[in-house]
Amino acid sequence: MTPQLDRRSFLKAMGIVTAAAACGGGGAGAPAPATATGAAPTAAAKPSGRISVYSALNESTNNQFVAAFKAATPGVEVDLLPLAAAGELQTRIKAEKASPKADVFIGGDSSFHDGLGKDGLLETYESPAASAVAKESKDPNRNWTGFYFGIFGIVMNTDRVNKEVGGAKPTSWDDLLDPKWKGKLILGSPITTGGGYIFIATQVFRFNKDEAKAMDYMKRFHANVAQYPGTSPQAIQLVSQGQFVAAPNWAHDILTEKVKNPGIDLAIPKGTGYEIGAVSVIKGTKNPVAAKAFVDWVLTKEAGELNVKLSNRVSVRTDVPPAPGAPTLTSVELVNYDRDWAAANKDRLLKLWQQTVGI
């Protein structure tokens, strides 16, 4: 894995330090979109046949994304298994390693793809279109490529926040430890969702990798948590329906839901974490040409623009502007998130968290 850069060096390597300063952007601390290059590559062999795609993207993205790929790649049919819990898809791919059932894994934090790559369950592939992706947002071992950034925030049911917790938005993660939140919070399961784990890792990095302090935080946070839903979209829905007051969750998914329900709101505390959403080809694919063509298309400007339009995610490409009002890596204050360390210590931290909170 590549060595972790400090936040300013990382932004500089991605080409956005100057832009951030010029725009008066907020915190530092993350990778940013890469300089875009030319059009989508042409496959050596014409893709055809059928592929199966395991998707951790949400419903608002999946169907239109697949339809757009099929329109751009005549002759390829796509069977889609949508399951907005990347951890469950990772487990499924591992269980099927002797006889793979899917060709492509799309969505979810890169740590899920990274784990599969280390287990030898992903094909080595660097798409020609990956030249538009900065090296900090793709696997140096060529197992996966990032195509979007997700920023972690908090979804709130505005009516219940006003009535039950005083109406003020949380400005720090520590605000969620106040006893007034007891029984009112939920969090996507850290075991099955990338967001849940990134929430834990964010606390570790907030405390400069002092795991004792981070686990003390998670224990106190757990005291205010009513449940841990299996998917991040499910947690947003429960807050949107008014069943719970708030949930740490993905900013882009919160903004997408807010279009349907203006009664929710987004807060982004200082020192937040982020994900690099990835795409990869599964080892043993029966249709490698079409599977690689899918990855090629996902990395195009066209796909990046569609992803932003459908989901409010931030594209890794600099030639794809963010959605209006969507937070970006330079408009929020990010924690110094050591992605390599988080991936390498994921299993251990999850076990430590389970021991700490008694789950």
Listing of model-derived features with the role each one plays in the protein:
Residues T2-T18:
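N-terminal secretory signal peptides and thylakoid transit peptides that target proteins
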Residues G24-A34:
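Bacterial lipoprotein signal-peptidase II cleavage site
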Residues P47-L57, V76-L81:
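Short, well-ordered beta-strand elements
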Residues S55-N63, A84-A86, K101-Q243:
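Extracytoplasmic ligand-binding site segments that recognize negatively charged/polar headgroups
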Residues S111-G115, S240, F244-G263:
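A ligand-binding cleft/hinge motif common to bilobed small-molecule-binding domains
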Residues G150, K180-G188, Y217-F221, Y228-P229, V259-T285, V298-P321:
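Periplasmic-binding protein-like
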Residues V155-R160, A201-F205, I276-P288, L306-N307:
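A bilobed periplasmic-binding-protein/Venus flytrap-type ligand-binding module shared by bacterial periplasmic
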